[in-house]
């Protein structure tokens, strides 16, 4: 598995080099610096090394972002189901992204907020956290706690700009990354 991630990362770096040659991305001292989950990270293009990121999936997401970045802003909120083939992929996304958080925090919404803040999220309503994935892409997770009448649920929204850059699987992986930091 590690080998296939390494191959994908290698191909992404090749694509990134082409983008840099065309002058579409600015670099300084062979490094790219950007915000990722409110943390400043650096990518050394010469060494093909990430400062501050160890996980292969996260490295691939960052490289996909850099390779497919588009100017402009689109903060219209959408869900996974709004994406092409979103309804088809939703059961898989639900089990990978929604269920782990629902099961962990269904009766503990304050701990949900506490953990979200701890990993760099911003509280935007009673049980909602906004996660700035990149400076122009964010996810919102809203927990609906369990009560006497209804089971717990989770709403996940993200700005449309994310769908303009990422494929549905990348967006699902971003959701999984957030979940892995929350559980």
Where are these regions (language model features)?
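Conserved binding-pocket/active-site segment within a compact domain
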Residues: 107-166
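Extended, well-ordered protein cores
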Residues: 67-81, 90, 132-138, 142, ...
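Short Lys/Arg-enriched alpha/beta "domain-start" segment
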Residues: 1-33, 58-119
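Short helix-capping/linker segments at secondary-structure and domain boundaries
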Residues: 69-74, 149, 181-183
């Amino acid at each position: 598995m590690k080998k296939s991630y390494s191959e994908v990362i290698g191909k992404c770096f090749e694509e990134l080099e082409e983008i840099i040659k065309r002058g579409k991305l600015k670099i300084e001292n062979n490094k790219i610096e950007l915000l990722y989950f409110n943390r400043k990270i650096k990518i050394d293009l010469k060494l093909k090394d990430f400062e501050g990121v160890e996980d292969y999936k996260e490295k691939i997401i960052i490289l996909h972002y850099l390779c497919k970045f588009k100017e402009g802003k689109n903060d219209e909120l959408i869900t996974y189901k709004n994406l092409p083939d979103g309804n088809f992929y939703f059961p898989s996304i639900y089990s990978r992204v929604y269920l782990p958080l629902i099961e962990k925090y269904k009766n503990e919404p304050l701990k949900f907020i506490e953990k979200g803040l701890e990993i760099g999220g911003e509280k935007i309503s009673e049980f909602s956290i906004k996660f700035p994935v990149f400076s122009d892409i964010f996810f919102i997770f809203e927990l609906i706690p369990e009560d006497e009448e209804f089971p717990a649920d989770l709403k996940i929204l993200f700005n449309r700009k994310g769908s303009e850059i990422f494929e549905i699987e990348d967006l699902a992986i971003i959701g999984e990354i957030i979940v892995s930091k929350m559980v």
